[in-house]
Amino acid sequence: GQTLKCRAVVLATDGPETLRLLGKPAAMASQGELCLYFAAPKAPINDPYLILNGEGTGVINSLTVPSVVAASYAPAGEALISVVLIGHLALDDKTAESAVRKELNEWFGPVVEHWRHLKTFRIQHALPAQPPPIPDPTVPAKPVRPGIYVCGEYQSVPGIQWALLSGRHAAEAVIKELAETPG
């Protein structure tokens, strides 16, 4: 319930929320995902790779082992495994976990039975739908209204690196605007 006065604002939210905050119809299409986390006695891979499912079948899109990058990401003495399913938001947690375990068993064998499910996250707007033409991610940010900037991957190419670049562009534009218009 507090109002703050400022000269510039950066909306760093997903596309539908940005549209809502700007008072525009939230008609932005996006792709949802499920992300399941497991703790395992031993990592299934020992390298910091993103494993993509190239089979064209199954529910799993990708798998990573974040604890290979930083052991502190996992519970003490265990490995942290992250499994992503694109779409499949209609699956309840138990069904999703069962389907993932079945598929992981085909990939890594019965060792998967010893993995402990930690949590399932449902990310409604994980990736924006971006039919061509896709905006150039290297173009500097411009205000959508005086003093209001937006950033996020829906502004350019889907992916965390482009979301971060979009944020940098918005920050640089705000710094420039504030330097040019003292106030």
Cite the ranges covered by each PLM segment.
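Conserved flavin/dinucleotide-binding core of flavoenzymes
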Residues: 71-183
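Mid-domain catalytic core of redox enzymes
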Residues: 1-98, 102-107
